[in-house]
UniProtKB/Swiss-Prot annotation:
GO molecular function: rRNA binding; structural constituent of ribosome
HAMAP family: Ribosomal_bL20 (MF_00382)
Any one biological process term the GO annotation gives: ribosomal large subunit assembly
Homology family: Belongs to the bacterial ribosomal protein bL20 family.
Gene source species: Ureaplasma urealyticum serovar 10 (strain ATCC 33699 / Western)
PROSITE patterns given in the database record: RIBOSOMAL_L20
UniProt-recorded name of the protein: Large ribosomal subunit protein bL20
Highest taxon, organism lineage: Bacteria
SUPFAM superfamilies named among the record's database cross-references: Ribosomal protein L20
Pfam families to which the protein is assigned, alphabetical: Ribosomal_L20
Keyword annotations from UniProtKB, A to Z: Ribonucleoprotein, Ribosomal protein, RNA-binding, rRNA-binding
InterPro entries the UniProt entry points to: Ribosomal_bL20 (IPR005813), RIBOSOMAL_L20_CS (IPR049946), Ribosomal_protein_bL20_C (IPR035566)
Keyword Zinc listed: no
Amino acid sequence: MRVKGGSVTRQRRKRWLEKAEGSWGTRNTSYRIARQTVIRAAEYAYRDRRNKKRDFRKLWISRINAAVRELGYTYSQFMNALVKANVVTKDGQGLNRKMLSELAINNPEAFNQLVNKVMK
């Protein structure tokens, strides 16, 4: 006797198609392609949640470097001076790169004072 799956198969397929809503073309109507789309989207999301952390760190370093170079120093010299002055520590205490980047953008005067104080 032939088994068609009935409501179980329909529910499973409906679940995949609902997850593929918002996709373009056949990707949200064809079960097979919709399922591939959802799986690939999940893989990209997983990968990019990790890449996001790298990208933001790169951005913060670039901003700090640009702000410090205006004052005649390099990023590595500045970070070394911060570590020696115990402003930045390895265990996460003190200022981090995100804070320094925000300070450089939103309050350049305070950032310049910090640089001048640390680089003496």
